[in-house]
């Protein structure tokens, strides 16, 4: 038994890594005292033995061996010790370490990180470098003055062309030269020197003074630059770390090489990009050893810079590196960024159990807190609950499971019991606000489409032209309670963004409300008739004795509201029995001698009576 490793951490922090930190990631000391970690060879595996090459991109000494087996295969099983076998010293341990052990490449010349182009501009704001100027230095097109010495024509950080530098060089090396202390550099080494000379506190102070006097767009740019420098100071990062002297090599199991059926190998694009870097780095180191001409060394440094650029972000600058079939190779940035990247695809978009997905169709007969769940989907999602209920009824699991697979009729009754009061959550991508995922009470329906109440569509931004939605089943009692109390559609009527109702009548509801309450002078059937109650009106309409839009009188002794003032009677009639009848625009009132209301008939249409009745029933329920 091996002790379980518990890696506890509070948070993940992304920042600049120093060369020492990168070296620490990859360096390990074997139990015999040997320090390993540097990848020096571009080879991956030996084509004859099919074993990883030592000090190569898949080296077992650097990244760890196959499961409990040494390089030559002599020692196997759980031998946790260092073995010197076939002149190869390695640690026999589990292969899982090949997923997290890193290596590093020590560069023969520093290279600039292509991802920090804009950060370079923020650091060099006082000089007024443009992005093109920084690139000219890095890619060996322009020289930069590192120290002007006693030359009056030169200034610190001034850019020089090839011709200008040759002219100054002639002056420096002439016999009667008076120039002293002049230093000029080119490439990432010059950039490294400039960055190392920067005092961040002074830069921040001068920026704050400039911001006080600046206005408009210039002020906004200065604030952006100050924010970058303040972040450097706050995190303790140094600007020179943006120029790399050491490159990390990610674990081999994250850039695998797989043998195909025909004996050929399929490999990750990263291996090709790493191989280019190592080849160019080794070639540069050899050229420096043999003291090759400066122009050749400089060209090799530029090629190394381009190889590292392609590894970090292929195609961002210069020519895109392509593999077989002219396909661009996937760099480290391509793996991380975008919809198919590591974050959005694998970390934020994991597939989960107890979930399903289907097309949505309208369910007009559903209540707002209900959704139609296809039987086929429901039996799969609620299978553990169904089996549990069958076992509690006296069955054994070997009887219960086959009943579901053969669609036994008794299973559907159990499923009905199981889903009663068990909410499910519906989610429609993209989930842009919290109402993009809500819970509903499932109702079993035939077919294979999820039925959705039309009023919740605005919250999901859903329509029925082929949209799909995901279903998730909350398992624990706590999650079910939260789904019911917090996430139920009937509890989410107001928009969290504006506070206004997001569930509002739409489409056929608006049309129906308009049609019921509209006026139609052509509707004369039953017009002018009197009815003793609202129920009598509905009954007469159902028996086709009156038109939907015919104006009638119906007795209603309660209070009425109108959008038009109706307080002055149009006509008053005194009756023989001492009562009087007041005729208003929209009602007819009969009062006794003391002015008490004996009866009230309102002037309306059967459509409005039906509409009022529907609202009253909804409020009562």
Swiss-Prot record:
GO molecular-function term, one example from the UniProt record: magnesium ion binding
UniProt keywords, alphabetically: DNA-directed RNA polymerase, Magnesium, Metal-binding, Nucleotidyltransferase, Transcription, Transferase
Magnesium is among the record's keywords: yes
The EC number(s) this enzyme carries: 2.7.7.6
Needed co-factor(s): Mg(2+)
GO cellular component: DNA-directed RNA polymerase complex
Swiss-Prot/TrEMBL catalytic activity: RNA(n) + a ribonucleoside 5'-triphosphate = RNA(n+1) + diphosphate
Keyword Protease assigned: no
Subunit structure: In cyanobacteria the RNAP catalytic core is composed of 2 alpha, 1 beta, 1 beta', 1 gamma and 1 omega subunit. When a sigma factor is associated with the core the holoenzyme is formed, which can initiate transcription.
Role, per record: DNA-dependent RNA polymerase catalyzes the transcription of DNA into RNA using the four ribonucleoside triphosphates as substrates.
Protein name, per record: DNA-directed RNA polymerase subunit gamma
Species of provenance: Nostoc commune
Gene that this polypeptide is encoded by: rpoC1
